[in-house]
Amino acid sequence: MATAVAAAGGGGGGEQPRRRKPAPGRGGVVLPAGLSEEEARVRAIAEIVSAMGELSRRGEDVDLNALKSAACRRYGLARAPKLVEMIAAVPEADRAALLPRLRAKPVRTASGIAVVAVMSKPHRCPHIATTGNICVYCPGGPDSDFEYSTQSYTGYEPTSMRAIRARYNPYVQARSRIDQLKRLGHSVDKVEFILMGGTFMSLPADYRDYFIRNLHDALSGHTSANVEEAVCYSEHGAVKCIGMTIETRPDYCLGPHLRQMLSYGCTRLEIGVQSTYEDVARDTNRGHTVAAVADCFCLAKDAGFKVVAHMMPDLPNVGVERDLESFREFFENPAFRADGLKIYPTLVIRGTGLYELWKTGRYRNYPPELLVDIVARILSMVPPWTRVYRVQRDIPMPLVTSGVEKGNLRELALARMEDLGLKCRDVRTREAGIQDIHHKIRPDEVELVRRDYAANEGWETFLSYEDTQQDILIGLLRLRKCGRNVTCPELVGRCSIVRELHVYGTAVPVHGRDADKLQHQGYGTLLMEEAERIARKEHRSKKIAVISGVGTRHYYRKLGYELEGPYMVKCLV
């Protein structure tokens, strides 16, 4: 054997040392001779991307998993290449064709925008000062077992962990999340911020200004001295802020608060309602009445904001029948009728007042199967103009003592609805982008649909372009004839307001165009023309206003609108 090795070495004379075989990877697969594991990985990624490009150019189907498996076997890789690694290796010429196949979590931008959630610093809930304590079910906050977390969060949710890593710096949170989405293959030309972490408007004004200023600066790249300057530069930035959502409470959603949020570029509010019963609000220590909820909905909508409510089934002393009746009232009573909904089934988490009730047997959650059934029945009640954003909290299951046992509650509820012959017709379920991703269905015959309803002392018109045969929603517009609660001087008098304009489908860059995508195909302009006709002919309004995201103001200027205060306004006479 030694002689054979020497001969193979090609040298003369003495015995040559044995050549060591390449180290096998996990599973016993041997790396190609002379390649380190890192070099083998780079070659495997290049081979996968090259094969994808070739198949795409020939118009053949691309089986990404098969290509990855073959490359891993050939190069003896212990771990398959990540999507982020493959996205970085795609040549510029092939990016348009290959990125949709490589995009991680495509649902992130299926609604046409990239959502960036950020958190303010930990602070105490404001109603401790008036009620002496927080809500009985609320975890987190500086006084809780999760002391470095914000109020109502544990610090272990994905958004919380990103915020903690950034030490709650708003600029770092926003910039790192945008860069992460970009690495995952998403278009981040259009960004919507969601401000989480408790009641933002209860924080000191100077901190709020610092936080908002840095969010806008993260998009524009400019270092601003104040919010007004930051908003101005953000309007012209390459990455557009098309909307901003702020979490608040009814007692921090009054006229002065609304005016301040408009100056920040805020377009949507998330308001904690939890229950439509006064006794439940009192027993759970909410610190406000249900009547206050109805009042703040009126004020918010008459200022043009979109309103998303948080509701909690399975609260103490409620029961199945009252829970279902509560949601029925929420959808049918004009005093509520929010534009969006987050359903948060009650969770028992250590350190809360509810945990103490659970320990002593004074509170028990619904059994898992019953909860799925209740959520299914709630989803069947949702009107077609309401969007269900979430169906459960993002709190990791190991931290939940009692309550929801599965992380896919929406999926289970939709399956139960199918068994019961029920259908969910909320906005999210019918969105074109969601339908394309989940069911590979694309709209065919598109028509304009109009729905009118009374809500919060005003006249609401929900305009949409839909494929009514397949029940697919392409775009929507929310138009309101304001009631008597107008607090903004720009809206006083005979004025109608567009509270939302949104065309669905995978995000397309602001100045881009893609014949295969639904955005930038003229649906938004058609919806605005119909809204102007209704405002002029039916509302008898003299002008129409739009609550516009800072980055979308140029779009409305092209349609003849001008900036007036925080709104884009057009005269109709």
From Swiss-Prot:
| Pathway where it operates | tRNA modification; 5-methoxycarbonylmethyl-2-thiouridine-tRNA biosynthesis
For the ligand ([4Fe-4S] cluster), the binding residues are 125, 135, 138
Record: residues binding acetyl-CoA: 190, 500-503, 523-525, 556
- Where it mainly occurs, coarsely classed, is nucleus
Record-linked PROSITE patterns: GNAT (PS51186), RADICAL_SAM (PS51918)
According to its UniProt entry, the function of this protein is described as:
Catalytic tRNA acetyltransferase subunit of the elongator complex which is required for multiple tRNA modifications, including mcm5U (5-methoxycarbonylmethyl uridine), mcm5s2U (5-methoxycarbonylmethyl-2-thiouridine), and ncm5U (5-carbamoylmethyl uridine). In the elongator complex, acts as a tRNA uridine(34) acetyltransferase by mediating formation of carboxymethyluridine in the wobble base at position 34 in tRNAs.
Would you tell me the protein name for this molecule? Elongator complex protein 3
What lineage does UniProt assign to this protein's organism? Answer: Eukaryota, Viridiplantae, Streptophyta, Embryophyta, Tracheophyta
